[in-house]
């Protein structure tokens, strides 16, 4: 069974983008390539349990096991040594990617306090969109009682679009609530 958001992309977004940007082929229409969730846990240097808890929460949110990221350089000011585990990340592709994006747009973002839409300035110039979330409690999989500390995360939506304008049209078509 195809995902609801993927069907919307194929049936509504592709024809709309083809008409708007005059693509010669359906294959030229931009699509979401992958979504990367990154949770940096700075206090994991002093307490490794914090990193385990963050990785568990990321696994619940994404539906797959996160990769533990390690420090590339030693930074004395942060008491950081090269090779120490300091975060977790997940790369979503295919069905899980569409399921996560659908859940993010329809369930999680509306649960953010004082939400007026996601910022429009977070495109990187190459058609990718980055979004910061201040707390993991907006996701329905996270039980409020089990949370020891609120942690934020970065969500990067990588698209095949060449420009920010094309990428924004794609994400708007998929239901991303941009701020006016």
Swiss-Prot record:
What's an example GO cellular component term for this entry? ribonucleoprotein complex
Which Gene Ontology biological process is one annotated for this entry?
Answer: translation
> Secreted as a keyword?
no
The molecular function terms of the Gene Ontology recorded here are: rRNA binding; structural constituent of ribosome; tRNA binding
| Record keyword Repressor present | no
Which InterPro entries does the entry mention? Answer: Ribosomal_uL5 (IPR002132), Ribosomal_uL5_bac-type (IPR020930), Ribosomal_uL5_C (IPR031309), Ribosomal_uL5_CS (IPR020929), Ribosomal_uL5_dom_sf (IPR022803), Ribosomal_uL5_N (IPR031310)
Ordered alphabetically, the record's keywords are:
Ribonucleoprotein, Ribosomal protein, RNA-binding, rRNA-binding, tRNA-binding
Which family does the UniProt entry place this protein in? Answer: Belongs to the universal ribosomal protein uL5 family.
Cite the PANTHER family for this sequence: 60S RIBOSOMAL PROTEIN L11-RELATED (PTHR11994)
Q: What quaternary structure, including any partners, is listed in this protein's UniProt entry?
A: Part of the 50S ribosomal subunit; part of the 5S rRNA/L5/L18/L25 subcomplex. Contacts the 5S rRNA and the P site tRNA. Forms a bridge to the 30S subunit in the 70S ribosome.
NCBIfam families, sorted: PRK00010.1
Task of the protein: This is one of the proteins that bind and probably mediate the attachment of the 5S RNA into the large ribosomal subunit, where it forms part of the central protuberance. In the 70S ribosome it contacts protein S13 of the 30S subunit (bridge B1b), connecting the 2 subunits; this bridge is implicated in subunit movement. Contacts the P site tRNA; the 5S rRNA and some of its associated proteins might help stabilize positioning of ribosome-bound tRNAs.
| Protein name listed in UniProt | Large ribosomal subunit protein uL5
Lineage, opening ranks? Bacteria, Bacillati, Bacillota, Bacilli, Lactobacillales
Q: Report the gene name.
A: rplE
């Amino acid at each position: 069974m195809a995902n609801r958001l993927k069907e919307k992309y194929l049936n509504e977004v592709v024809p709309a983008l083809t008409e708007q940007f005059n693509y010669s082929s359906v294959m030229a229409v931009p699509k979401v390539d992958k979504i990367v969730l990154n949770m940096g846990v700075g206090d994991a240097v002093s307490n490794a349990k914090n990193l385990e808890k963050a990785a568990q929460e990321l696994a619940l949110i994404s539906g797959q096991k996160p990769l533990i990221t390690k420090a590339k350089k030693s930074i004395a000011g942060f008491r950081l040594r090269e090779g120490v585990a300091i975060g977790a990340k997940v790369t979503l592709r295919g069905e899980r990617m569409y399921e996560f994006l659908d859940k993010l747009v329809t369930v999680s973002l509306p649960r953010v306090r004082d939400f007026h839409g996601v910022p429009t300035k977070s495109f990187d110039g190459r058609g990718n969109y980055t979004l910061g979330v201040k707390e993991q409690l907006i996701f329905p999989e996270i039980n409020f009682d089990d949370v020891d500390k609120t942690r934020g995360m970065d969500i990067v939506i990588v698209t095949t679009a060449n420009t920010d304008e094309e990428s924004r049209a794609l994400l708007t078509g998929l239901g991303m609530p941009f701020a006016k």
